[in-house]
Amino acid sequence: MPAPTAPPDPERLPGFVLCRGGLEGVVAEELRDLEIAVVEKRKRAVEIETDLAGFYRANMGLRSALNVLRPIRSFNARNYDLLYYQSRKTNWHKLFPVEARIRIDIKGHSPKITHTRYAIHRVKDGITDTFRKLCEGARPTIEKRDPDVHIVVYLEKHRATLAFDTSGVPLFKRGYRLEHGGAPMKEDLAAGLVALSRWDRCSPLLDPMCGSGTLLFEAWMMAAGIAPNLHRRFGFESLYDYDREIHGQERNRLQAKERSLHEARFLGLEIDPRTFKTLERIRREHFPRAPIELKCGDFRKTDPGSGFRSAVCNPPYGMRSGDEGLISPLYEDLGAYLRQHLPGGQAGIYTANHEAAARFGGDPEDSVSLRNGSLEGRLYRVAF
């Protein structure tokens, strides 16, 4: 006779944390550090089980994730009509107020649901028809830019899950990368690259081509134990079961983990004066306590000093017409510079120019594939 199974804990809730492909392992480790149970790693997602406090903690504390979804209903998505019927069966009026402004998006893929706009339309009809019937004709308004409630239809093969995006605004929008030069790296990718670079989070860290500083700022927050999203608004705050007291307790719990870095050293070099001004402004306004030294100049003409054993870098890819002849020499110079100033050390270098990456030299240990927008980038981990 099989052993009886324990009844499900009504306070435990399923969830999905969405991320870039290649960062599933990093996100799973971050969740464990936040004491949130990881059920399974999936493609571009990590399944979790937690409580309300865990959802709040995940949103404030995750570094390499994009969104935290809280499922409402899952079903077999054989056709578009089922999207409507399942949306229609959900008691939305008990979950958030009719005055809320809502946005609906599709995430994932399904062989049966291929027309994204029509799928969104059917879910929208199901939600608004439910409100009209149960709220005397009133219904939420659709707001794409700044919604109160973000509803996601998460597709996985033949299954669909209606879920709240408890994050609201994507988690990579920390609030400090409001202006920048060139093509900026998003914060979730930067945090993931630092985590995968094998830097120990305590030794000096060098970025010889730091741009607007995202890699260094994320690295400092990791080392200092600073949760990246403590002071922003989240989607879960618009739901009826939002608990302000628990939210405050979890914020205090995360703040208690912060630590001072009296002997830490971070150095960023940037050649472009305009980008450097933006970099200094971000540092001054958002990271005044960070022990990050910034220098404007060409790394090839700048001595970083002794003591560096680790570096992270996101050099130009040379994808624009006319740049091809400049990138290979630049990558050779970068490799020679790191070999000179990181004796016995290692670097994590991220690029989408895989042909030129061979010019770094050193001892290439391995690489990790991580997309940067439409580009197939890789993090090359090189020992010098």
State each model region's role.
Residues 2-147:
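Non-catalytic nucleic-acid substrate-recognition regions in nucleic-acid-modifying enzymes
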Residues 109-112, 170, 316-320:
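A short, flexible beta-alpha/helix-coil linker loop
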Residues 151-167:
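C-terminal edge-of-domain segments
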Residues 162-196:
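SAM-dependent Rossmann-like transferase core, predominantly class I methyltransferases
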Residues 308-314:
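Short SAM/SAH-binding signature in class I
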Residues 8, 14, 18, 22, ...:
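Conserved Class I SAM-dependent methyltransferase catalytic core
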Residues 93-95, 301-307:
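Short amphipathic alpha-helix with an adjacent loop that forms part of the alpha/beta core around
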Residues 185-304, 319-320, 324-326:
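Conserved S-adenosyl-L-methionine
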